[in-house]
């Protein structure tokens, strides 16, 4: 499976040859390098371990630094593992970029959504609010929990107020609009989860025909 790590730069818009405006998210994947190879004979599966993002040496813990030193690779901020079909295509120290994807290709994008803190039902789940005037005491409070007298308690999993955001979100089938291999920049159609400078994982779509 083809996959890379990137940093979210922000959103902009581009024009197609037909003059249509397309909203795109700009992602940069610079400095991603193969740190370790895992083979089916030794580890039971084929995968590569990649490092991404600059980091100061003083901020790298010794076990992690030793892992990079063993591969003779400069320490990176993030360390992730990707399953691959053909392990022979990769070598330790090899740099990977956005050129593994083509314009028009569909990809899946994963990131950590923006944290919203503690929020109520209306914002967190989109529940309808009550009247805002004329003696209403409902306003933005939650409605019936549907527990009735037979249960007598709040059922686990009931949509309620609570912590919102700051969780892994995956968006499927985003289209690759442009690829700039020189600057290691890729433009994807639509929005991508997470804040600016957030870590993003881009992989080939698993549901290409849907």
Name what the model sees in each region:
Residues 1-210:
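Extended basic (Lys/Arg/His-rich) segments that typically form rRNA-contacting surfaces
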